[in-house]
Amino acid sequence: MKHKKKNRLVVAISVALIPYIGVTGDIPDSFRDLWGEQDEFYEVKLYGQTLGIHRIKTTPTHIKFYSPESILDKINLKKEKEKELSVFFTNSFSRNGNMSCQGNTTIQYNCNYIKTKSVDVIVDDVDNVVNLFIGNEFLDSEAHNDEYHQLSRNVKKAFIQSQTINLSDSGKYKRLSISGNSALGITDTSYAVLNWWMNYNKSNGYSNNEKTINSLYFRHDLDKRYYYQFGRMDRTDLSQSISGSFNFNLLPLPDIDGIRTGTTQSYIKNTDKFIASPVTVMLTNFSRVEAFRNDQLLGVWYLDSGVNELDTARLPYGSYDLKLKIFENTQLVREEIIPFNKGRSSIGDMQWDIFVQGGNIVNDNDRYIEKQNNHKSSINTGLRLPITKNISVQQGVSVIDNKSYYEGSLKWNSGILSGSLNSEFSFLWGDNAKGNYQSISYTDGFSLSFYHNDKRVDNCGRNYNAGWSGCYESYSASLSIPLLGWTSTLGYSDTYSESVYKSHILSEYGFYNQNIYKGRTQRWQLTSSTSLKWMDYNFMPAIGIYNSEQRQLTDKGGYISVTITRASRENSLNTGYSYNYSRGNYSSNELFVDGYMTSTNNGDYHEAGMRFNKNRHNAEGRLSGRINNRFGDLNGSFSMNKNRNTNSTNHSLTGGYNSSFALTSDGFYWGGSTAGLTKLAGGIIKVKSNDTKKNLVKVTGTLYGDYSLGSNDNAFIPVPALTPASLIIEDNNYGDNNISILAPTNNDMFMLPGNVYPVEIETKVSVSYIGRGFDPNGTPLSGAHVLNEPHVILDEDGGFSFEYTGNEKTLFLLKGRTIYTCQLGKNKVHKGIVFVGDVICDINSTSSLPDEFVKNPRVQDLLAKNDKG
């Protein structure tokens, strides 16, 4: 909480009054007003954890809580000790200011700490914080449990939803995907979740619409270790800590309408990071890559030629086939399917985890069920056991329509020599199906990775119980080595697929004979690049060779390119030239220019970009833009390509939007991007102010950046559920005003899905007046009380300095029984300060006081005391 100037004054005055403590009769008359009890607002912290802003009665030596029950409600206490502790809170407490760190951020020995068996406080007047200390016998032992996160107490139940829209339009090929994630808080330990998506597809005059509910279930957590849930469920949660971090690569786990129970890692205090199988794309030209799960568009990437790794942070959790569509010059040139697995890391958790689920299988595009009206049941279970802190084994069993499948896996993450090794080995055995999976990566100044996935059903037909058809095997490997200032990367992939169903083979695979469809693609690519800097320019030459064999088609070639970049903090301009030789497609050269501009203004992020490239056959231009703020993340691009040989023109349009909202018992609040979150919680920010200005408050710690809020603004700020999060409130001081904030500076939270953490912020916009006051005879009005603001007394030469939040331009003084009015004039405000100089004040009467002054108890008390005097 920020309101420091006044408190520094109080500290100084308190120090000045130390010689008079205990001898109140010797207190100078000019300080008696400050010595009395005052009402202040302080942030209260219990062992460093904020309990919010509370009204405190203060004197220079003691404090007293105005409303102890509002503080006790936010503390985990032993039930049998609540009454005894409430008695302590009715007492006054010594300030213990000498034990405060006084806002010092550097570590000091034993400051801001008292060991107590009852209740004690340390008042930090610099940061406006009351540090509260309570004896351990009063606190619930769970509140000090370092093993588990504690759920935030000051929360409200809400309905929270995020919505994502992705579209892609390439003329004859159109796709629109809309998806949503919802969470509803029900009790302190339970909630409901909904996940859905809709697709609209149109290609060559054929169109279809799809609607799917992936998840709709009720969940209840037990003792921070166990859970049960029932409803419709997919396998996404199983890959995350919320359901034990089970990452199965091969085991069939269908969507079910049923029940699941098991252990959870959500509350454990450990480093939570995602692990994902690599998605390597080898490109020979600048390309657009679209990623799909089933028919749902997950994201779009624009990538340069070379061996590229997709950013898997943008992809959802789970184990599924990732379909990649690769476009060059707005034309679809090939498709790839990559088995993908993404989950939370469980290595080193040093606890066992288990789950069991059962129910009726949901028809997932005929994946597990032959006909729409067929009904099958499924029972699945999994167990993971850590062997050491670096090794764990995982086992899973699925029984689908009385057919059994088993997957066993071992994960080993370790430091070897001076590098890091991450590996996973799995195998599957089951009814008419088998498979194996290996993933190994090693980094030690260089990077080496290997990936292999092999899945087969008998006779390469269709196994509805296993959930896949045909036989599929893929290898990929990459090696990246820095040498003599150059980085060289060698990538290799080999994919083989065989099926009796043509519809289950990608478009690049063709007819083999009357009964079998086969396809094989082998690719390797070697690239080498470096970066040279000269003044503000970066020169990036690159060279590469490649080989691609697909059915009876072979393409071999190479390319060389150079890119020149000039970049600043907010702008970038690139230009480059590339020459590509292909034995199959002859040679081509290409010139491109691209650039982008970004700006951030009061929490709003704006980005605009353009690219133009031209070769012997095609010319293409692309415009892109992005806006990200507290109302959502909107991005889009438009490309136009002209073929000089056919004189035809093609276009491509892509776009995306993500936002969120929360509905609570006291209102509707719109929010920004959820950045791919699947379990939603958030903060509700409400701003009140004595001013109408915008951009008074800055909120940091959000998913996309900073929020900037003004007077009477409300906002929902999404944060990940069951993950520690923090929202930091800061004043947005600018221009010619001071901004003071009455709110906790750091708001730490840990919440279930469907819960919101309310933060009410009161801001005061003020200016500081500095000058001297004189009576009509030119005599300094020393000792006069300023009626406009409390606790301000003119010094010996009539000097005054105070912050004022009102609009009144007249200074009202009281000296003895005389009221003076001083016109502050129209002096300019500079950085929140008005220097009024020497002011001649007129003698006036009580009738000259504004009504707000006359009705003010503080002013009434001063007038009464002076009348008696």
Curated annotation (Swiss-Prot):
UniProt KW keywords: Cell outer membrane, Fimbrium, Membrane, Plasmid, Signal
Main location: other
A Pfam entry, by short name: Usher_TcfC
Localisation: Fimbrium; Cell outer membrane
Signal peptide range: 1-22
Top-level lineage group: Bacteria
GO cellular component, one term: cell outer membrane
InterPro entries xref list: Pilus_assem_C, Pilus_assem_E-set-like_dom, Usher_TcfC
Record's function text: May serve as anchor for the fimbriae in the outer membrane.
Protein name, UniProt field: CFA/I fimbrial subunit C
